[in-house]
A protein has these predicted regions:
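Surface-exposed, charge/polar-rich loops and edge strands
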Residues: 1-409
C-alpha cells in the first residue's frame, strides 16, 4: 500500500446535496435510470439499459445476491409506548439460515428505538402467522455498545422466525429517504437476483438490473457470478470524527462459493463489481488470501479482515498477485472440504488503498462525507469531484433509489 489514510479529514469529502436531488422513490422501470460513465478520466452519460455496450466481451461481473429482511419489529407496551426492535445480526444460532429456521426461540443483536420507555419486562405481540395464532415476546439481554441482545420467543412450533419476520416485520429503508416504508418497497428495494436473506439494507447498485439487462450482458459475452455480503445498518453510520482514524467500520458477513473463486482465477483475478458491497468483498478476498499464504493453518476467525489490515501489510505481501491470493483460498477450501468461504470483513477502502481485484465498478451516488465516497475516491484516484459535479449539473438522482454510474479508472 502506498500510504496510510488514517489522517484523511472527512471534511475534504463534502459536497452540497440539495434534498430535492435525493430520489425518494425509484423509477417505475428499474433499468430506465441514467448511467454516468467515467472512463479513464472522461465523463459522459447514457441510459442504464446501455450498460452492456461499455463492458468488453469476456469480462467477469460479480453481484451481491443478499436479500433484505423485514428487520424492524414494532411492539406497543401496555402504557401505550411504541418500541421498535431492529434486528441487526443473528446471535443464537449465529448462522443466518439456521436462525431463520428456528422455531419457538431465536436471539438477535438489535437496535432498540425508544429504549428509555422499555426499562424492564417483556414486550408482547399477538399475531396470526400462516393461519395460526401465536404470541411473540421480546426480552432484553446484555448490552453491546448501542445495541442489545434480544431473546424472541413464540408459542407455536410450526412457525419459524423467518415466518414471523415476513408477517410482522417491516422492511428497513434508508434514513435518507425521510419517509415511511410503503408496500411497494417490498419489491423495489430488492434486487431481481436477491436470494440469501440477511441484509438490513439493499446493495442498491443492483436495483437497476432487470432480466433484460442481465440477458444483454450474457449475450455480450459477460460472465455473471455471485457472492454474498449481508449489509449491516452500519452502512448508514455517519463519520463523526474529523479524521477517519476515529471512525470504526462495522463488521459484515461474507460468503463466496468455490465456483466464484475459480471463475475469478480463470479471469486473472480481475472483475467488474456491482456495488460497493461486492467491491469490499472482492478486495477482502485478496487480503484473506495473503493471510493464508503467510499462515496456511489460519482458522476461520483468523481470516476476518480488520479495518486497517490492508495498510499494515509488508512490501512482500503487497507483491502477491490476485491470482495467488485467490488460489490460496481455494487450497484452504480443499484442506477443509468446504464448498464456500464464510468469514467477515471490516475493511475500509480510502485514498491510499491499492485495488487488487476490482477493475471496474457499477455504483450509485453516495452521501457526502461517507466511507463509500472514500471508496470511490480511492478507485478513481481522487477524481470524484469531477464525477459528482457532472451528476449534480446534469440532473442525476442521488442515493439508494437514485441513478447509476460505471467507473473505469
Amino acid at each position: 500500500m502506498k500510504e496510510d489514510p488514517r489522517h484523511i479529514r472527512i471534511s475534504e469529502f463534502n459536497y452540497p446535496l440539495p434534498d430535492e436531488r435525493i430520489a425518494k422513490f425509484p423509477l417505475s422501470v428499474r433499468d430506465q435510470s441514467k448511467l454516468l460513465l467515467y472512463r479513464h478520466g472522461e465523463v459522459s452519460e447514457d441510459r442504464f439499459t446501455s450498460l452492456p455496450e461499455y463492458l468488453p466481451s469476456g469480462s467477469l461481473m460479480i453481484f451481491n445476491n443478499t436479500k433484505v429482511i423485514q428487520a424492524r419489529l414494532h411492539f406497543r407496551k401496555e402504557t401505550g409506548a411504541l418500541i421498535e426492535v431492529f434486528c441487526l445480526e443473528p446471535i443464537q444460532p449465529n448462522d443466518y439460515a439456521l436462525n431463520f429456521q428456528q422455531t419457538e426461540h431465536a436471539a438477535w443483536l438489535c437496535m432498540v428505538g425508544n429504549l428509555k420507555k422499555w426499562k424492564e419486562g417483556m414486550l408482547r405481540r399477538e399475531m396470526t402467522v400462516k393461519g395460526k395464532s401465536l404470541t411473540l415476546t421480546a426480552e432484553r439481554g446484555e448490552c453491546h455498545g448501542t445495541s442489545h441482545w434480544i431473546n424472541f420467543r413464540w408459542n407455536n412450533p410450526e412457525v419459524t422466525f423467518a415466518d414471523i419476520l415476513e408477517v410482522f416485520g417491516e422492511l428497513p429503508i434508508p434514513p435518507s429517504l425521510n419517509r415511511e416504508t410503503q408496500e411497494s418497497d417490498k419489491e423495489t428495494y430488492q434486487t431481481v437476483y436477491s436470494k440469501i436473506k440477511g441484509s438490513v439494507a439493499a446493495p442498491t447498485a443492483g436495483l437497476h438490473f432487470t432480466p433484460r439487462v442481465l440477458d444483454a450482458l450474457r449475450n455480450k459475452g459477460v460472465e455473471l457470478e455471485e457472492l454474498t455480503l449481508h449489509v449491516g445498518a452500519g452502512t448508514f453510520k455517519p463519520v463523526k470524527s474529523e479524521e477517519i482514524e476515529g471512525h470504526e467500520m462495522h463488521t459484515e458477513y461474507i460468503s463466496v462459493s468455490r465456483n466464484t473463486l475459480e471463475k475469478l482465477i480463470v479471469h486473472g483475478g480481475k472483475a467488474v463489481a456491482v456495488g460497493t458491497t461486492s467491491v469490499r468483498t472482492l478486495e477482502s478476498l485478496y487480503h484473506i488470501g495473503v493471510t493464508l499464504l503467510n499462515n496456511p493453518e489460519a482458522t476461520e476467525e483468523d481470516l476476518h479482515v480488520h479495518q486497517w489490515q490492508p495498510y499494515e501489510m509488508s512490501a512482500k505481501a503487497t507483491a502477491t498477485s490476485a491470482v495467488e491470493a485467490l488460489q490460496a483460498i481455494v487450497a484452504y477450501l480443499d484442506r477443509h472440504s468446504m464448498e464456500a468461504l464464510h468469514t467477515s470483513t471490516q475493511i475500509i477502502i480510502a485514498p491510499g488503498y491499492e485495488y487488487k481485484i476490482v477493475k471496474a465498478m457499477v455504483t450509485n451516488f453516495h452521501q457526502p462525507q461517507s466511507t463509500l465516497l472514500l471508496l470511490v475516491s480511492a478507485f478513481v484516484h481522487g477524481d470524484w469531484p469531477k464525477i459528482y459535479n457532472y451528476a449534480l449539473a446534469h440532473d442525476f438522482r442521488f442515493l439508494s433509489y437514485g441513478d447509476s454510474s460505471l467507473l473505469i479508472p
